[in-house]
Swiss-Prot record:
Function: May be involved in both secretory and endocytic intracellular trafficking in the endosomal/prevacuolar compartments.
Family: Belongs to the PRA1 family.
Free-text tissue specificity from the UniProt record: Expressed in roots and trichomes.
InterPro entries attached to this UniProt entry: Prenylated_rab_accept_PRA1
Protein name (database record): PRA1 family protein G2
Pfam families: PRA1 (PF03208)
Chief location category: endoplasmic reticulum
Keywords annotated in UniProt: Endoplasmic reticulum, Membrane, Transmembrane, Transmembrane helix, Transport
Length: 186
């Protein structure tokens, strides 16, 4: 009887920081490019009151899954506008913090290497949280940011509730991931 081969393990190869940044920016642009056409968001489809609470929930869920990237852009734009009206410095500082979150947390695929040392995920997360708290405290923009995000969310919720979603067709994978249809895989 021959011994079984050792299990195969996959190890990611650490990349330099500038490669992590460029890959993160590429992932961000790929994510943003998946938005639905704005004309489809605004002009196509009819707007009406839902007939029941269950149809309201289904319509909202379908619209949120279908227009998720568009809604994210709307909320971000409202938050940015609120920060511009408060202080341009606040917009720059909070924008830099958001960029740090996108690059070093959400779109990073490989371990972060700084000065030949691998930085752990907890350390990166702690740094990002502390930087975010500092930025909001430094710019006194917590109220303005909350108002901007709230207005953006309100606009998206109103659109999701009143836009009739009967003619929207999601890709099968999007519908399964969004929980709109079940999967046969168990």
């Amino acid at each position: 009887m021959t011994p079984s081969p050792p299990p195969i393990t996959y190890i990611s190869i650490p990349l330099p920081t500038n490669d992590v940044v460029s890959r993160s920016i590429h992932n961000l642009t790929t994510a943003i490019s998946s938005h639905r056409p704005w004309s489809e968001l605004i002009f196509s489809g009819d707007f009406s009151l839902p007939e029941s609470f269950s149809s309201l929930l289904l319509r909202s869920k379908t619209n949120f899954n279908y227009f998720f990237v568009n809604y994210t852009i709307i909320v971000s734009t409202c938050a940015a506008f609120a920060l511009i009206t408060a202080s341009p410095v606040a917009l720059i500082v909070v924008g830099a913090i958001i960029a740090l979150w996108l690059i070093f947390h959400f779109f990073r695929e490989d371990p972060l290497i700084l000065w030949s040392f691998q930085v752990g995920d907890r350390t990166v997360l702690l740094f990002l949280v502390l930087a975010s708290v500092w930025a909001i405290w430094f710019t006194n923009s917590a109220v303005n940011l909350a108002v901007g995000v709230s207005v953006g969310l309100l606009l998206c919720i109103i659109h999701a509730v009143f836009r009739n979603s009967d003619e929207l067709f999601l890709e099968e994978d999007d519908a399964i991931n969004g929980g709109l249809i079940g999967s046969n895989l168990r």
